[in-house]
Design a protein with these regions (language model features):
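Non-catalytic terminal/interface segments that mediate subunit docking, oligomerization
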Residues: 381-413, 418-421, 426-427
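Active-site cores enriched in adjacent His and Asp/Glu residues with nearby glycine-rich loops
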Residues: 3-43, 63, 178-202, 322-384, ...
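Extended, domain-scale alpha-helical bundle/helix-rich regions
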Residues: 111-131, 141, 145-149, 155-183, ...
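Conserved small/polar residues in nucleotide/adenosyl-binding loops
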Residues: 527-535
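Structured core elements
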Residues: 26, 47, 59, 66-68, ...
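Short, charged beta-turn/beta-strand-edge "cap" motif at the junction between a beta-strand
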Residues: 119-120, 401-406, 512-516
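Conserved catalytic alpha/beta cores of large enzymes that bind or transform nucleotide phosphates
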Residues: 244-285, 295, 420-445, 449-454, ...
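N-terminal accessory/capping or targeting/presequence segment of soluble
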Residues: 2-108, 120, 124-263, 367-368, ...
Length: 535
């Protein structure tokens, strides 16, 4: 079946490309801050190709288009791309070209590649420059062509910033700024440009509401050893925030003036930024002003190692959150087959239970409630109009979490609702074994998540089965549910950072088995890493 709506949108984009002399146009999944989850304003890729997953890049030429996404979304992408004319490219699969390889193969000498430089990270942009240089490809990044096609595009999000009691964080802003400036000095940098939203929220002990399920505010910051300049939208600024900023000698600026300010401000010495997070467009500004030092944001590792206050609050929050999940499991098992129940209505009930918890702010991601064959799609999302009815047979996979004043949660349970096959029992057991093996791990300091991944994955590998995603990720503190730099995965792609596991870090532990057309099983538990006391 032809998806005429999407084909018409692609045709409109191609017309705009032609008017602007662009032969190929690239649309990643990102906002101006390289965020994993983005507001509706930034969902350009979904608008143009119908794929709704959280990770994917669309590349459009005059005669063809392709979407690149990872193993979490292969099944979902196949369904959503049907009839669009967009080809699915399964990332990291054999004989599948990367985005760069595809462009090298398809683009002719002297052609033009376009993208919005505000939503492409510097590292990838510089790699494209290098990989396409032999063909003398021109890169244009100063215009959002899709904006001319998406005529009813939502407005840029803008919500007042929350300034919680600083006792909640275990450190005040002065202490955090001092730690960051110490790292800047160690790198020989006189300035630091920050654009990663959760890092900014952590550093200034504030929270926002500009991205669904992620308590962050669209913002930038520029630090020197003596100054801190913070850029955010007028509608995000409150009197409480003004007082908070004044207390810590933070200068507030309009968000939309960040680029212009960086082009004209006084810069002495070098500027530090993380090329994996700063946009290509902003990097070009910095590159023209000063020597740029590519280094990880100091905030990233500092944020990843939770202090005692954060850990204590997280433990309390997880206890309350777990009670809600237990109530939900009891409710589902007691009522399935007795009252009308769907994937969607079950998810709504769990969301309601969480909303009653003291300190509740929001979900930490949209609840995944997947029954039967739908659970084989790792990030399936049921809607009121498109969901399966539950019956007292098979399994319901529920992956969910909450944001609270005190922590962020992420938990998955696969609930057996009735009779299942022997194969499913064996798969369920393998997943449980993997989760328990990783939970009980003791390891030498210096290990990274790549050293530990096999503990969770081995029971699946013993059955010649694998899951096409990582095993675990860090969890933010009243921040993004996916946090780095730590993670547990066996495959190293070169784009991901590897750091030793430190005491105070946290990771999820989430092995799984996904059999297309049959079932999906995942168990996710939150794990706190601590130093092991030896005799």
């Amino acid at each position: 079946m032809v998806n005429q709506k999407i084909q018409d949108r692609l045709a409109a984009l191609r017309a705009v490309m032609k008017e602007n002399g662009v032969d190929w146009y690239m649309v990643p999944t990102a906002d101006f801050h390289n965020s994993e989850y983005v507001d509706a304003y930034f969902k350009v890729r979904e608008y143009l190709c119908n794929f709704s997953g959280s990770n994917g890049t669309l590349i459009v030429g005059m005669d063809e288009a392709g979407l690149w996404t990872d193993g979490r979304y292969f099944i979902q992408a196949e369904r959503e791309l049907t009839g669009t004319g967009v080809t699915l490219y399964r990332m990291l699969e054999d004989n599948v070209p990367t985005k760069e390889e595809f462009l090298q193969q398809k683009m002719e000498n002297g052609q033009t590649l376009g993208f919005d430089g505000r939503v492409v990270d510097t590292r990838f942009g510089l790699k494209l420059e290098k990989d396409l240089a032999d063909k003398q490809i021109k890169i244009v990044y100063g215009k959002d062509l899709a904006d001319e096609v998406w005529t009813d595009r939502p407005a840029l999000p803008c919500h007042p910033v929350l300034v919680p009691d600083e006792a909640l964080f275990g450190q005040n802003v002065s202490e955090k700024l001092a730690a960051v400036r110490k790292d800047m000095a160690a790198h020989g940098a006189s300035g630091l440009f920050l654009s990663k939203l959760d890092d900014l929220m952590w550093l200034l002990n504030i929270r926002g509401a500009d991205v669904e399920c992620n308590p962050v505010a669209l913002s930038y910051a520029y630090l020197t050893q003596d100054e801190c300049h913070f850029f955010l939208q007028d509608g995000e600024v409150t009197d409480v925030l003004k007082a908070h900023a004044a207390k810590y000698h933070i200068t507030l600026h309009p968000y939309e003036e960040a680029a212009e300010w960086m082009e004209s401000c006084t810069i002495t010495g070098s500027v530090m930024c993380d090329e994996g997070n700063v946009s290509y467009a902003f990097y070009k500004i910095l590159e023209n002003r000063a020597e740029v030092i590519d280094a990880a944001n100091p905030t990233e590792l500092l944020k990843a190692v939770k202090n005692e206050t954060e850990l204590a609050n997280m433990q309390e929050v997880y206890l309350k959150d777990s009670v809600a999940v237990c109530k939900f499991i009891y409710w589902v098992k007691k009522n399935v087959g007795k009252i009308p129940m769907t994937e969607y209505s079950a998810a709504m009930y769990l969301d309601h239970l969480r909303s009653e918890i003291d300190g509740y702010l929001d979900l930490s991601f949209p609840t995944i409630s997947a029954y039967g064959t739908n659970a084989a799609m790792m990030h399936y999302e049921a809607t009121e109009d498109n969901c399966a009815a539950l019956a007292p047979e098979g399994m319901l996979l529920v992956d969910s979490g909450g944001q609270y004043l005190g922590g962020t949660t992420d938990v998955t349970r696969t609930i057996v609702l009735g009779p299942v096959s022997q194969t499913i029992k064996e798969h369920y057991t393998a997943v449980a074994k993997g989760m328990l093996q990783l939970t009980d791990a003791k390891f030498l300091y210096g290990c990274t998540g790549r050293n530990l991944d096999i503990l969770a994955r081995q029971p699946m590998w013993d059955q010649n089965i694998d899951y096409k995603c990582g095993t675990g990720h860090g969890v933010g503190y009243i921040l993004n549910v996916h946090e780095g730099p730590q993670g547990i995965r066996w495959r190293f792609t070169g784009n991901q950072k590897e750091v030793p596991i430190e005491a105070g870090m946290d990771v999820t532990n989430e092995p799984g088995i996904y059999i297309e057309g049959s079932h999906g099983i995942r168990t996710v538990s939150y794990t706190h890493l601590r130093a092991h006391e030896t005799a």
